[in-house]
UniProtKB/Swiss-Prot annotation:
GO MF terms, alphabetically ordered: 5-methyltetrahydropteroyltriglutamate-homocysteine S-methyltransferase activity; zinc ion binding
Annotated EC: 2.1.1.14
Entry binding sites for L-methionine: I431, G432, S433, E484, D599
CDD domains xrefs: CIMS_C_terminal_like (cd03311), CIMS_N_terminal_like (cd03312)
Keywords: Amino-acid biosynthesis, Metal-binding, Methionine biosynthesis, Methyltransferase, Repeat, Transferase, Zinc
Lineage: superkingdom: Bacteria
Binding positions for L-homocysteine per the UniProt entry: I431, G432, S433, E484, D599
Protein name, entry field: 5-methyltetrahydropteroyltriglutamate--homocysteine methyltransferase
SUPFAM superfamilies: UROD/MetE-like
Cofactor: Zn(2+)
Cofactor binding note: Binds 1 zinc ion per subunit.
């Protein structure tokens, strides 16, 4: 039996982020819809051709999305919230953009759909909305049109469809509550219609993605798969596709389904391929996801070959990416600034396609010469001085439990901090960043390009910090920040100043819609060669008698928003970062900075997909934070900031961080989030966000006062702070001034009440 290869999907944005530029041009009214559609066609044609040229047998179609593939599925099913519908009932690309962004070149603006993380990745999807008695119909033929496009170009294709059970799992009920799983029989006819249309086009295999099968699902949801796939069987072969974790726990459910193949993620799961071979029906195809679709590392193909060799020829076998290559940058060959050694360790999406071709050929021929050559740099990396720093490894081994304990418990620290800072009731502060103006961005860009020397750059940054301090003093804030003018991104900035990280020029991956991120890559042991934030914090503090917060990004967030190493555990990386930043805390303290904020917005999103794995993750995540912070003296106040919509299930861990003050995002939930802290009897201080910084709207004083009074019903007033929801870097100065003035006024009114 000949072994074939395939990918589960390919990056959409284009090597030079062409899709992003076309989207934003269209949204701004600078280009036409036809011009936007033409860019999409050009990108799809190029990406199919590139994958084919790299040696991919079966090309994915339907992985392209104008905003998000879950949103594409919503349109396919005719699931358009009433507020986003066209007056004439039709669906077009602007309908899609209104759901994603709240506005489009045509139609009335309306609140965008909710956006949340796609499983445990850094990609975000638009949450489907379900209402009782909802009707579904095939209204958006993008998948069929793109299949026709690919077939016309002569490609051998495999359409990609998000499966019905996972689609319902990912959504939320709006309005009257009901069980959204009850909609399964209503959406299945649309799926049947789509699969019938694909069969008419001569399609043999359809990749139907059901990543929910890697979760610890309630029994009712597991039971739903059998009737769903009974309804879909028969017209084409179905490749049931899972990723991001293993499927062993749900294998009994899976093997009872009337499908013809199963794709498993053999990178992130712990499934044994020989056990899968033994338990799957013999006539099924097994697609082995052995090439990591969500990292940048070259694969050890000799290891992958050994993993699969025993079952090659025993059943129909494909080799594939672990998940869609959406989560990987496109092409390593355009990275001209990486040195040859480091570059030899990497593989981006196109190189991962080449890996799949090399692995397929070796398994078919038995000749391992080429895969041995490919894997040689991986062996060399194991001994590279770029990777291993004996001093870091030694320091990690020397950690004791005492290293993650503050000198005294919170009540003792709180007394020392009150004596030091003497803050008023309802103390006001911000989360850290101030508007990143075109002047600030231009200053950083000129310096990066070499058009501005270091002295003039520093003078410029100092001036922006001075302005930020002056603005805050005018507004009457109690605890100030320096505004972060020198920082492009809260993770990238620290990565640039820590040994063990490298940066790419074009390593962009899609985060959501037109937003792309360029994550740093952890290539080796992490250490801090010199202080990072001390100089600017010290300068800002010299400009005022009020306390200025030192601002750090926490170890778990830096880990989660980077491409991590694969040769050590995530726990090891987090603790290395924590030790490096521990030294930063000590240096800030020595420089006279008395309040230090360590942001951990990613602590919750780093949770493993299986709940049974949560405790182990949270244990080391909390320890990393404490290791970072515990060097601080009693009268140094440690803050942390988190932006989650759910705290209930991790409250123990939030409390275990033992931060003196936690600031959280609560304005959009009308302070409901504080219920978790009240029920838990959270012992330390809390700053519930009093206005939503994601909106340009300026909250009025009475509204903020009402929110704070509501907060004081749940949390003792002496432990409450007053602050916005999040950092202000994306806002303009006019609305920032107005909103903060109202926030300060509300706090002053409550002090006098």
């Amino acid at each position: 039996m000949t072994i074939h290869n395939h990918t589960l999907g390919f990056p959409r944005v284009g090597l030079r982020r062409e899709l992003k530029k076309a989207q934003e041009s269209y949204w701004a009214g600078k280009s036409t819809r036809e011009e936007l559609l033409a860019v999409g066609r050009e990108l799809r044609a190029r990406h199919w051709e590139q994958q084919k040229a790299a040696g991919i047998d079966l090309l994915p179609v339907g992985d392209f999305a104008w905003y998000d593939h879950v949103l594409t599925t919503s349109l396919l099913l005719g699931n358009v919230p009433a507020r986003h519908q066209n007056a004439d009932g039709t669906v077009d690309i602007d309908t899609l953009f209104r759901i994603g962004r709240g506005r489009a070149p045509t139609g009335e603006p309306a609140a965008a759909a909710e956006m949340t993380k796609w499983f445990n990745t850094n990609y975000h999807y638009m949450v489907p909305e379900f209402t009782k008695g909802q009707q579904f119909s095939l209204t958006w033929t993008q998948l069929l049109d793109e299949v026709d496009e690919a077939l016309a170009l002569g490609h051998h294709v495999k359409p990609v469809l998000l499966g019905p059970v996972t689609y319902l799992w990912l959504g939320k009920v709006k309005g009257e509550q009901f069980d959204r799983l009850s909609l399964l029989n209503d959406i299945l006819p649309v799926y049947q219609q789509v699969i019938a249309e694909l069969a008419k086009r001569g399609i043999q295999w359809v990749q139907i993605d059901e990543p929910a099968l890697v979760l610890e699902l309630p029994q009712a949801w597991l039971d739903a798969f059998k009737p769903a796939y009974e309804a879909l069987k028969g017209q084409t072969k179905l490749l049931l596709t899972t990723y991001f974790e293993g499927v062993s726990d749900n294998l009994d459910t899976i093997t009872a389904l009337p499908v013809q193949g199963l794709h498993v993620d053999l990178v992130h799961g712990h499934d044994d391929v020989n056990e899968l071979h033994r338990r799957l029906p013999q006539e099924w195809l097994l697609s082995a996801g052995v090439i990591n679709g969500r990292n940048v590392w070259r694969a050890d193909l000799t290891e992958k070959y050994a993993q699969l060799k025993a079952i090659a020829g025993q059943r129909e076998l494909w080799v594939g990416s672990s998940c869609s290559l959406l989560h990987s940058p496109i092409d390593l060959s355009v990275e001209t600034r990486l040195d040859a050694e480091v570059k030899s360790w990497f593989a981006f999406a196109l190189q991962k396609c080449e890996e799949l071709a090399l692995l397929r050929d070796a398994l078919n021929s038995g000749d391992t010469t080429k895969i041995e050559q490919w894997s040689a740099p991986i062996q060399a990396r194991k001994h590279s001085a770029r990777v291993h720093n004996p001093a870091v490894e030694q320091r990690l081994k020397a950690i004791t439990p005492q290293d993650s304990q503050r000198a005294h418990a919170y009540p003792v620290r709180a007394e020392a901090q009150r004596a030091r800072f003497n803050l008023p009731a309802w103390p006001t502060t911000t989360i850290g960043s101030f508007p990143q103006t075109t002047e600030i961005r231009g200053l950083r860009l000129d310096f990066k390009k070499g058009n501005l020397d270091a002295a003039n750059y520093r003078t410029g940054i100092a001036e922006h910090i001075k302005q930020a301090i002056a603005e805050q003093e005018r507004l009457g804030l109690d605890v100030l920040v320096h505004g972060e003018a020198e920082r492009n991104d809260m993770v990238e900035y620290f990565g640039e100043h820590l040994d063990g990280f490298v940066f790419t020029q074009n390593g962009w991956v899609q985060s959501y819609g037109s937003r792309c991120v360029k994550p740093p890559v952890v290539i080796g042991d992490i250490s801090r060669p010199a202080p990072i934030t001390v100089e600017w914090a010290k300068y800002a503090q010299s400009l005022t008698d009020k306390p200025v917060k030192g601002m750090l990004t926490g170890p778990v967030t830096i880990l989660c928003w980077s491409f991590p190493r694969e040769d050590v555990s995530r726990e090891t990386i987090a603790k290395q970062i924590a030790l490096a930043l521990r030294d930063e805390v000590a240096d800030l303290e020595a420089a006279g900075i008395g309040i230090i904020q360590i942001d951990e917005p990613a602590l919750r999103e780093g949770l493993p997909l299986k709940r049974s794995d949560w405790d182990a993750y949270l244990a080391w995540g909390v320890e990393a934070f404490r290791l970072n912070a515990a060097v601080a003296k009693d009268d140094t106040q440690i803050h942390t900031h988190m932006c989650y919509c759910e705290f209930n299930d991790i409250m123990d861990s939030i409390a275990a961080l033992d931060a003196d003050v936690i600031t959280i995002e609560t304005s959009r939930s009308d302070m409901e989030l504080l219920e978790s802290f009240e029920e838990f009897e959270y012992p330390n201080e809390i700053g519930p966000g009093v206005y939503d910084i994601h909106s340009p709207n300026v909250p009025d004083v009475a509204w903020i006062e009402a929110l704070l009074k509501k907060a004081a019903q749940r949390i003792p007033q002496e432990r409450l702070w007053v602050n916005p929801d999040c950092g202000l870097k994306t806002r303009g100065w006019p609305e920032t001034r107005a909103a903060l003035a109202n926030m300060v006024k509300a706090a002053q009114n409550l002090r006098q009440a």
